[in-house]
């Protein structure tokens, strides 16, 4: 506030001096008008900035629940340090199941999150996926698909492609929506028996995503999402995520099962966590996707 007040004062002061001199020297009338117009524009801009900051501070003050939710959600992600194994299963409308072994590890470093997933198909083929998310929520994805000896950057236009034929996409593997610029607290709702905050997250111009918005139903007691709806850009259908088996280990809440459903499409996909550790003490060397692929080649 002080900086803006000083800026406004410095904007008006030269205008006052010039106007006083213009009265004494009439031949500078045109210069006086130009300076007055320029000064008016500057002061108007400064006033608009001031009003916008006041409005923003009032909005934050009026939504302490919003600030608490965002802080807790981000802190939960910033404390990640786990290894886990489980199954990723696509369930067709007729009940037919296709299951994949799912192995993942994640750790938050000083420059952000790293998540490495290894998905084994019904045969011996494996897909590797390395996601990086910066401290501001910017995402980068590398993949190594069956038959590829080296990993490569996944083009943005493929981020929302199905992951090994399931309803999960590549970008669904991280919760970057909590780091997006635009966050709105909607009216509270019940989801089943749970009282929930409802948070609507929208990406800013700098956020790379195929989603137009993500709406999260967050349990008021544990501040963990129990239901999420992602709206794709354009005319694409919505995608729904349901979290089951919520548990607290070492003070950290997590889900043991996540189900993904695509609106208008029969069946669903289920990610089940079967075992793991929430304190894996991982380092950067544990997220070398090229090293993983080299080890796989040696093991054949």
Locate predicted features.
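N-terminal mature ectodomain segment of secretory-pathway/periplasmic proteins
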Residues: 64-147, 184
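N-terminal secretory signal peptides that target proteins for export/translocation
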Residues: 1-37
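Surface-exposed beta-loop interaction hotspot
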Residues: 177-181
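Gly/Pro-enriched, hydrophobic low-complexity segments
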Residues: 150-152, 161-163, 168-176, 190-290
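Short amphipathic beta-strand and strand-loop transition segments with alternating hydrophobic
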Residues: 105-107, 184-190, 244-246
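Bacterial N-terminal signal peptides
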Residues: 42-54
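Short, low-complexity, Pro/Ser/Thr/Gly-rich segments in the mature regions of secreted, periplasmic
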Residues: 287-299
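Boundary at the C-terminal end of the N-terminal hydrophobic targeting segment
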Residues: 59-62
């Amino acid at each position: 506030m002080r900086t803006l007040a000083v800026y406004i004062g410095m904007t008006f002061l030269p205008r006052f001096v010039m106007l006083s001199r213009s009265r004494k020297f009439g031949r500078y009338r045109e210069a006086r008008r130009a300076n007055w117009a320029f000064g008016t524009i500057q002061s108007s801009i400064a006033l608009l900035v001031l009003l916008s900051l006041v409005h923003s501070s009032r909005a934050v003050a009026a939504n302490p629940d919003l600030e608490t939710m965002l802080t807790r959600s981000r802190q939960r992600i910033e404390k990640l340090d786990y290894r886990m194994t489980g199954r990723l299963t696509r369930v067709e409308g007729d009940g037919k199941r296709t299951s994949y072994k799912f192995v993942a590890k994640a750790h938050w470093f000083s420059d952000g999150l790293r998540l490495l997933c290894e998905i084994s198909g019904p045969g011996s083929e494996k897909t590797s996926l390395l996601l990086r998310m910066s401290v501001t929520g910017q995402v980068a994805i590398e993949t190594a698909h069956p038959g590829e000896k080296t990993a490569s950057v996944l083009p943005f236009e493929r981020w929302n492609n199905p992951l090994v034929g399931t309803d999960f996409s590549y970008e669904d593997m991280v919760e970057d929506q909590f780091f997006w610029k635009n966050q709105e607290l909607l009216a509270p709702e019940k989801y089943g028996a749970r009282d929930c905050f409802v948070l609507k997250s929208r990406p800013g111009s700098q956020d790379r995503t195929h989603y137009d918005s993500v709406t999260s139903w967050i349990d008021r007691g544990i501040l963990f999402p129990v239901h999420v709806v992602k709206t794709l850009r354009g005319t694409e259908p919505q995608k729904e995520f349901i979290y089951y088996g919520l548990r607290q280990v070492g003070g950290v809440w997590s889900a043991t099962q996540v189900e993904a459903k695509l609106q208008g499409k029969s069946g669903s996909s289920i990610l089940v966590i079967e075992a793991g550790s929430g304190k894996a003490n991982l380092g950067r060397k544990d997220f070398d996707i090229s090293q993983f692929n080299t080890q796989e080649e040696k093991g054949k």
